[in-house]
Amino acid sequence: MPVTGFDIALRRPLAGGRAFGAAGPYEELKGRLRFAVDPAHPANRAITDVELAPRNARGRVEFAADVSILLPVDLHRCRGRILLDVVNRGNAVAVPNLNHATRPVFGPGSDPNPPIDPGDGWLMGRGFVIVSCGWQCDVPEIPGLLRLRAPEARGRDGSPLRGRVYTQLQAAEAVPHFFLSDRGHIPYPAADLDEPDAVLLARDLPDAEPEAIPRSRWRFARLEDGRVVADPRYVWLQGGFAKGRLFQIAYTAVGAPILGFGMVALRDSVAWLKHSASAEGNPAPGVLRWAYAYGRSQTGRLLRTMIHLDLNRDEAGRRALDGVIVNVAGGMRGEFNDRFGQNSKDRPHMMRHLEPFQIEPRERLKVMLTNTSAEYHRGDGSLIHTDPDGARDVAHGPDVRVYHFAGTEHGLGNWPPTDRVASPADPAGWIERSQNIRGVVNYGRLLRACLVNLDRWAAEGVEPPPSRHPRVEDGSAVPPEALAKMFDRIPGSRYPRHHALPQRQDFSNLPPEPGRAYGSLVSAVDEDGNELAGIALPEVAVPLATHTGWNLRHPDIGGTEQLLLFAGSMIPFPRTWREREAAGDPRLSIEERYRSREEYLARVRQAAVALAQEGYLLEEDVELSVTFAARLWDHLTDPSSTR
């Protein structure tokens, strides 16, 4: 068994010993899993540079991962299900997303072991054992984040490797220097501070012609107390970096940790829980049979990469995962198995790993691909179900479902409505401001239904609801520019004049050479600007506003022609017909649509019940949908509220 030990550093009751329905009280175990894997085993051969890893006396490669496990105190009350929470940049995401809970924010000086907010306890009430496993060796050096401690690849003479790195840097305010990484991650240090072939580019749009910044104007350095101090982890620019501009740097770095062991840690941690005995440190021996993974955004892309590399069977040939929910990953994978890869890189125009966009697991792994409108307007969302040119639909196999959550943004909505949101998982604490109010629709209810349907599909053979997404054949998938005419009629909608679509690129040299754009498509919209395709939650199906998957950057943070990546918009309907007439808004006002709050909520309930009957929503979440809609009604009909 590749897991050689579990060192428990913290054991405590969850939520003060609160009982979660039939599963009873839970406890949290937090510590470190130790691994020793055979680098020559076929199960590990897909790992880049595995042959260059240092080995112990038994010829094994050792590494370790931080782990948090939530499980019932009485294991007899466990339903035999594991949910692998594929942590995002060191942060747990499954409980916050599926339980409507608050995720702790880790930063310098924060408590590394804050109490876990269980939210409404939904996952625990269903008896899931939830394991959160660190898989990144480059997460910011902040206590509390779950990380991987992986070995570095070495040359035949034992020296550290050198290689080319290409990364993008952008700030919400003017800065004198940048850390050479995304969101404070541990960077690859420059091998030569004076490297003449290092390149720094600046762009105003992701696909615009770059401006090459003369080498004499920038250095590998940081500004400290007014002095420029040489530092291989930073880049400094004479005159500073302007807010909102996109800066891309290509340079030679030194020191390459073996990133692919992160996927091995995920696989083997699940296999250990499913198959090992208590003598091997398993806290739940003999009770866990089915395992599912939830990954969102970055970690959804990681799951896509694991499936692509066929990394789901351990050294004993045993299947780890039985099903996965790949949420808001669009059509991308990532540099999760690359020499000098960057785990946090997440912009499609910076990615070498795009094609193939479709996923077909090589074994009977059940896969649900869920995306919001933001991934479609980002440009890669539609490519998981069309050909690369966007000319025709491409069908998936029987073990895959594709769901588009209409009118939603990348995150699970923002409440109360605002145009200012903290940049996700960013230790710098940047506040991202948008030109429109951000999206408010919380699609966590749809994810809960996906997990229940995934479990029934894998464990009982019950088919889940059919895929639902924009399609070329019925005209519901259209180029993004096709929406401009509609939105230009809505006062103050600020529809983007330019969508920077993903391009075919030659990454044999860095910076890469761009080529032809992919055929990216988005959902067509109705006369209110709401999307016609996908799964529409009641707040979208019975609307009080136009809900979109796009929003532009605000002048306060620069780059005003760029999409604020991941952001959606809420564009409220006028309250009254008088407001509508005064504004010249073609959309009916709230008072023209609904005679009263009671009528509106009755229609919301009807839409929620219909969605539950189709299987896309759980019956238990019908009333939650009504509650969310009532909150939105009260806000948008209050004359004193900010719209």
Regions found by a protein language model. Give the residues of each.
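C-terminal His-loop and adjacent cap/lid subdomain of alpha/beta-hydrolase
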Residues: P2-R643
